[in-house]
Amino acid sequence: GGRLLYDAASRGPTVYTTFICSRDGLARNGAALAALDRALRATQAWIHAHDARDLARLTAPFFTELAPDILHAAIERYRRNGIWSETTHVNKEGFDRLACSLHSGGFVSSRIGYEACVHNFDH
C-alpha cells in the first residue's frame, strides 16, 4: 500500500482531475464549459493567493470529521508539494504520464494521444 503511494507521488506531475466529455458534448455545451473553465481559473487564483488557514476555514464545513489543525496541516502539505495547479491547462507531459500509467497498469488496453483527447480553452 504505502510503496504504491510513494511510487505514484515520485513519478512527477500527472494529470488526474479533469473534466471529460465527448467532442459532440463540447460542441453542444462549449459556452457552458468555457464558463466552468473561467470559474475554475478564478478558484485556482484564489487558492494560490490565500494561505492554508484561509482555505481550511472555507472548506472546514465539508470535512467535519477532521480537527481544524489536521485539516490545516493537510492543506499546507498539499500547497508545499504543489498539488494544486495554477492553471486549467491540461499539461501534455502530465497527460502522457497518466496515459502510460493507466496502460501499464492494465486499466486501459491502448494509449490514446494527447491531441485526440484534450481541448484546452484559450485564456
What are these model-predicted stretches?
Residues G1-A8:
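Ligand-binding "clamshell"
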Residues Y16-A32:
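A bilobed periplasmic-binding-protein/Venus flytrap-type ligand-binding module shared by bacterial periplasmic
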Residues S110-H123:
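Hinge/cleft segment of the Venus flytrap/periplasmic-binding protein
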Residues D7, H89, I112-G113:
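Residue-level detector of family-conserved "landmark" positions at structurally sensitive sites
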Residues A27-S109:
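Secondary-structure end/capping motifs
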Residues L4, S109-S110:
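Residue-level detector of short coil/turn "hinge" positions at structural boundaries
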Residues A8-V15:
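A structural motif
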